[in-house]
Amino acid sequence: MMGGGQQQQLQQLSEELQAIDEEIDELREEVDDLQSEQTSIDEAMDAIQTLESGATVQVPLGGDAYVRAEIQDADEIIVGLGADFAAEQSADNAVESLSTKQDALDNRIESLRDDIDELETESSQLEQQAQQMQQQMQQQQMQQMQDQQPEDNE
C-alpha cells in the first residue's frame, strides 16, 4: 500500500504544476496581446508616414462601421497618451511617441518571456520530482507485495 504522506505530496506537486501551467498560459496570452498591440502601433506609424493632406481615408466608428473623411492636415496627429488622454502632435513627434511605446512593449514582452522561462524551468523540476516520487512509490509497493507472498519451504 502507498504511503499516505507520499500520496499527499504527489497530489500537492500535481496542484503546483497545474497552477504553474495556468500562469504560463496567462503570461503567453499577455505576450500575444502585447504583440498585437505592437502590430497595431507599427501599422499606425506606417500610416502616419504615408498620410497626405487632402487624402480620403476610412475612419472606423465601431461595430464594423466606417465613414469616409478627408485629411485636412497630415502633420496634425492625435496620439493616445494612456488613461483616456490624448495630445495633438506633429507627424514626426507622433511617430517618436509611438516608437517609445514600442520600446516599452518590447521591454515588457522580454520581461514576460523571462518569467515564462523561469516558470517552465520550475515546472520541469517539479515534473522530475513527481516522476521520481511515483517511481519510488511503485518500488515500495512492489517490495510490499513481495514481502507479503508466502515463502515456499518445500
From Swiss-Prot:
Gene Ontology terms describing biological process: protein folding
Self-association state and partner proteins as the record states: Heterohexamer of two alpha and four beta subunits.
Lineage, opening ranks: Archaea, Methanobacteriati, Methanobacteriota, Stenosarchaea group, Halobacteria
Similarity-based family: Belongs to the prefoldin subunit alpha family.
NCBIfam families (UniProt xref): prefoldin subunit alpha
Protein name in the entry: Prefoldin subunit alpha
UniProtKB keywords: Chaperone, Cytoplasm
Recorded GO MF terms: unfolded protein binding
Organism encoding this protein: Haloquadratum walsbyi (strain DSM 16790 / HBSQ001)
Role played: Molecular chaperone capable of stabilizing a range of proteins. Seems to fulfill an ATP-independent, HSP70-like function in archaeal de novo protein folding.
Locations listed in the record: Cytoplasm
GO CC annotation, single: cytoplasm
